[in-house]
Amino acid sequence: MDLTREQRKALNEKVLYLIDSGSAEETGITSEDIYNAYTGEGGLHGLERADFDSYHAYSEKKKEIENGQFFTPPAICQLVAESLRPSISDVVADLTCGKGNFFNFMPVETNCYGCELDARAYKVAHFLYPGASLELADIRAYKPDLRFDFVVGNPPFNLKWYTEDGERLSQLYYCVKAAQVLKPL
């Protein structure tokens, strides 16, 4: 079923209300319902291409509003998990975890670590994966106390991030950060 932008916004707000109020369980709403309903901010910018002189100008404004948010489809997350085959002792991180789609396919929730900048997506991830170690933070400030066996994720793309090393594209910064937090081979 395809929802309009307005319907998606309203559904996202209802999900957040259920989590904030603690009424999801008492109303019979399951974690699976929350997982399937919350879509995040991607595509909810309300911009129209016709209002911009170029596709580039439209795309830049869209990136600014959405902050690069796009939740990885569950089938892709499942494929990644099946390809990696993490064991029950492997510790897995997603440095821009969104609502935690990759965690859904990991063998042990308490071995999942995530960082998320968007407070709403973080709230949903925390609700869905209460055993995971999640941090509401910018990936650039994320300093975990341990190293990981695997880093999975779908970083924001083509955002210009300013770091102590200068300007970097977000996806390249993600790769550098992943290398820093992975266990040595």
Model-found features: residue ranges?
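Class I S-adenosyl-L-methionine-dependent methyltransferase catalytic core
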Residues: M1-L185
